[in-house]
Amino acid sequence: MSEDLHDDPQDSDSPPTRKRPRPGERRLQILQTLANMLEQPGSERVTTAALAARIGVSEAALYRHFASKAQMFEGLIDFVEQSCMGLIRQVTDREAEGPQQALRILSLLLQFAEKNPGMCRVMTGDALVHEHERLQQRVNLLMDKIEAQLRQSLRGAFEGSATPTVDVQVTASVMLAFLMGRLQRHVRSGFARKPTEHLQDSLMRLIR
């Protein structure tokens, strides 16, 4: 979510002026800056004071765009959810149901987290410690949606089993645990251990 947010250089002969962001621009800038701050390995809890200082505005200016810091994090969770569900739709639209579809979903979600370390901290809940509990509840609901899709992908994979429903549920649960474990390791290592490390070999062991 990062991009250059600096104003264009001003002509040296004219007095410096501060551009007023267009509607929605400042809101996006706040979310981008918050995401960038979460990408710093070992970063502590982000305060609104630090966020405002990074952007170069007052804390009051932040609250003209968001009612609370929790609402800022909800904006990041919205981005994570839209991105994850969009990636899942890409897979389900192109590939038939089965174990390979489920593994492809895991692969894309891990790649997304690797490219967006700040969002990875949101997905694991690491960035939400000491924040409003509803934020973690929203992330939990997202993980429930992902697990439900994994079950859907695996639905026909155990038709010859004596306990197909249990097998689907257990396999989907193990896959989600693998996903979360990789994300948590990425965060704990200061983003040094990549979620996609030895990915294909690891994924194949999930369906042996």
Task: Locate the predicted segments by residue.
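N-terminal intrinsically disordered/low-complexity leader segments
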Residues: M1-E25
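Hydrophobic/aromatic-rich alpha-helical bundle segments in the mid-to-C-terminal region
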Residues: C120-G125, Q136, N140, F158-M204
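Ser/Thr-centered, proline-biased regulatory motifs
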Residues: E44-A50
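Alpha-helical structural segments
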Residues: E25-N36, Q40, R54, Q71-R94, ...
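Short hydrophobic/aromatic patch on the recognition helix
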Residues: G56-F66
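Short helix-capping/turn signature of helix-turn-helix
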Residues: F66, G125-E131
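Helix-turn-helix DNA-binding module
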Residues: A52-A53, E133
